């Protein structure tokens, strides 16, 4: 027993002399773990946009797909068809394509202009997004066609407070000036989003757009907990009059920035997945190297111990 303890102490002394190998191995393992943590976090972030919205995994963008094209730009009349076909299966909302930021200001302070991102959407769309109302109500917004919804930050920029329902706001939209009344204030977009907005304006539809077969200015979003079933139901929506070979499909809002062009998951997230795979290999190799170093040191001492025993030491 005394000889075994003596050789164990010798092994520890050997470890001290070969400590640089152990240190390098530990540092390598630590670096590989950091890389793995970063890569997993990167992949999670890129696949979970709009995670601040309640039930964000149930939000899907409706897209048209055929052999030539994959797009989210749809005809207005398809929105009514989607809503009619899905019924109680899913919540349906419509919104326009978003352009750049536009100018807003208060009627009594035209010299103070703010640039803000507009979302022109139906009232159903606001409810579908799960916006938490801080002031006012969505019922007030739905009751009139000139009510807008401000985010908390936008309300504070314009008025310095959030209890601003009934106040007026001017919006300069391209060649025209619009006067709105604030109907509600909702929480901000608190993170990365595929549908960022500073204020939500009414979805006004021009007469030529309602039954148009060429003005694809609208987008449709649905909230459903059963996407496979909902997508199957979308096959019943008649779009053959405009696209005989087309069909409607669902793309998760949280991954729309990567998969909105029709790309599959692996193709869309190739770099993130590759980085995770490389990081896993680094961790595995670092663990193997660490075990090899420590095993080599202690096995050397064990062989020395066995040799001493065989020589009768």
Give the label of every model feature segment:
Residues 15, 82, 126, 151, ...:
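Conserved structural-core and active-site-/substrate-pathway-adjacent residues in large, well-folded domains
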Residues 11, 30, 42, 78, ...:
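Structural preference for long, well-ordered alpha-helical segments in enzyme cores
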Residues 36-165, 170-178:
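Structured, solvent-exposed hinge/loop segments at the ends of secondary-structure elements
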Residues 6-16, 20, 24, 288-313:
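Intracellular coupling helices
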Residues 21-35, 272-292:
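Alpha-helical transmembrane segments of integral membrane proteins
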Residues 121-137, 146-266:
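Mid-to-C-terminal secondary-structure elements
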Residues 1-8, 12-17, 21, 235-281, ...:
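Membrane-helix entry/capping segments
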Residues 10, 14-46, 57:
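Short, strongly hydrophobic transmembrane alpha-helices
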């Amino acid at each position: 027993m005394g000889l075994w303890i003596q050789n164990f102490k010798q092994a520890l002394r050997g470890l001290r002399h070969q400590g640089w190998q152990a240190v390098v191995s530990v540092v390598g393992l630590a670096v590989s773990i950091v890389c793995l943590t970063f890569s997993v976090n990167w992949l999670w972030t890129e696949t979970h946009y709009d995670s601040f919205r309640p039930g964000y995994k149930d939000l899907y963008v409706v897209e048209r797909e055929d052999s030539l094209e994959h797009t989210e730009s749809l005809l207005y009349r398809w929105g009514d068809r989607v809503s009619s076909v899905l019924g109680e299966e899913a919540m349906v909302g419509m919104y326009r394509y978003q352009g750049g930021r536009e100018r807003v200001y208060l009627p009594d302070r035209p010299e103070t202009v703010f640039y803000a991102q507009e979302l022109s959407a139906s009232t159903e769309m606001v409810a579908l997004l799960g916006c938490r109302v801080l002031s006012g109500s969505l019922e007030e917004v739905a009751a009139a066609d000139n009510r807008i919804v401000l985010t908390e930050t936008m309300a504070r920029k314009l008025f310095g407070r959030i209890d601003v329902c009934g106040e007026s706001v001017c919006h300069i939209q391209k060649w025209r000036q619009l006067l709105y009344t604030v109907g509600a204030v909702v929480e901000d977009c608190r993170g990365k989003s595929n549908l960022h907005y500073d204020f939500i304006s009414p979805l006004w539809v021009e007469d030529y757009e309602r039954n148009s077969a060429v003005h694809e200015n609208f987008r449709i979003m649905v909230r459903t907990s059963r996407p496979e079933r909902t997508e199957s139901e979308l096959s019943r929506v008649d779009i053959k009059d405009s696209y005989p070979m087309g069909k409607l499909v669902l793309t998760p809002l949280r991954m729309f920035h990567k998969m909105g062009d029709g790309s599959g998951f692996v193709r869309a997230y190739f770099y993130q997945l590759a980085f995770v795979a490389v990081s896993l290999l680094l961790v595995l190799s670092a663990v193997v190297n660490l075990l090899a170093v420590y095993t080599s040191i202690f096995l050397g001492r064990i062989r020395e111990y066995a040799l001493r025993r065989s020589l009768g030491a």
